[in-house]
Each structure stands twice: as C-alpha cells, then as structure tokens.
Amino acid sequence: MTTAPRTPNPLAVLAQTRLLPAISPLESAVVNAWADACIEHGVLALELLLRGDGSERAAFGAITRLASSHPQLAVGVGTVFDARTAQRACDAGARIVVSPITDPATGSTCAAAGVDWLPGAFTPTEIALAERSGATQVKLFPALAINAPAFLRSHLATKPSSRIIPTNVSLDEIPALVAAGAAGFGVGERLLAGADPRSASAIGERLHAALSVAGGGAY
C-alpha cells in the first residue's frame, strides 16, 4: 500500500532549511518551476505573494493545484494584511500565512485554522507584539530599509530568544545576516538575480547556493 506524501509544517521547514522562498508573478510556469526546484532541494515550503488586483484568485487557485500536483510541498500566502484575507487563504488550503505587519486578529484566525503564521515587524516593540500574539518566528520587514545585520545584533543582544527572519534578501547578503543571528531568510526575486524564473534548474542552483551559505539543510 502506497502512503501519500505528508505535507510538512512550514515553520519546521524554515527552521531546518533556513529558507522560505516567496514568489511573484503567479503564472503557472513560474509557480511550477519553483515548486519543482523546492522539492528537489528539500526546501518544502513556498510562499505565493499577493500583488494587487486578481492576485488573490491566482494565489488561492495555485494552492489548490499544488496541493494536488505537489502534495509534499507546504504552500502559503504572503502579503496578507487582515483576518479576512487570512481566512480566505486558510480556506484555500494555505499552510502558512505571511504578513508585512503584525495583526493579532490575523494570528488568531490562523491559530483557529491550524495554519502557521509569520507576521512582519520593523521595531522591537512590533516584534514583542508579534511574539505576545503567538508568533514563534517574526519576519523583519522592510529589511532592505535598514542595516539589518546591525539591527539583529542590537535586538538579539537584549532578546536572544527572538527568531527573526529578514526577507527578500540576496545571496550576497546572507553571510552577514547569519553572523548577526538571523534565524532564516525569505528569498525570491533578488536571489535569482536575473536567472530565468521559469527554469527549475536555474532556481535550483540558487536554492542550493543559498542553503549552503545560510547553513541550512534539506528537510
């Protein structure tokens, strides 16, 4: 008897691999290439970014399709600002909801649905709010707007238990962030740096390099 692949826990994947790929646009060729590359390299979580009108339908439809075609991949939705959108994502089968802000109602919605939540924060106060609201890992956003390594060193010196995830980082930025104590990284367009987003092999090469630099391992 063949056992169906079990969808992993996205935050567990992030803790092991130290990577959470996030992609846009959501055309099928791009989504499938990323999904195939993620599975090949053991990065078994993928975030689909909401970007303007029509993106919710595209993201939620992609989740449904990937659940059927790539059941071993935990797929989630990013750029979620409110509980209504979070509920729609959960109903569509998302396994993680990622936000640029910390909205406790969104966290409660995810908890009720048994879905992982990765909220965003930009200050120590916002990080504390996210943690008090149930987050075990917190996205640093917008990480590109500050000296992220310096921020991490300062924050973790006072709150070493925080698990902070800078996002939209390039391969060259990862070593300094690792040294500063980042718990993981959101990667996507800047990781590709001009490589074909429809090529699973090109994406896989960058994921392999990022895993090596980040100190993560296949899940």
Predicted region positions:
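Catalytic beta/alpha-barrel core
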Residues: 22-24, 44-55, 72-81, 94-103, ...
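Shared catalytic-loop signature of beta/alpha-barrel
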Residues: 129, 145-165, 169-171
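Conserved N-terminal beta1-alpha1 strand-loop-helix module at the mouth
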Residues: 1-92, 112, 171-172, 196-219
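Glycine-rich beta-strand-to-loop/alpha-helix junction loops that act as flexible
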Residues: 77-78, 164-169, 185-189
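Glycine-enriched alpha-helix->loop->beta-strand junction motifs that scaffold or abut catalytic
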Residues: 39-44, 70-72, 90-97, 111-118, ...
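Glycine-rich phosphate-binding active-site loops on the catalytic face of alpha/beta enzymes
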Residues: 96-106, 139-148, 181-203
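Short, charged, surface-exposed secondary-structure boundary motifs
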Residues: 106-110, 127-132, 148-151, 175-176, ...
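Catalytic cores of alpha/beta
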Residues: 34, 82-92, 125-134, 169-185
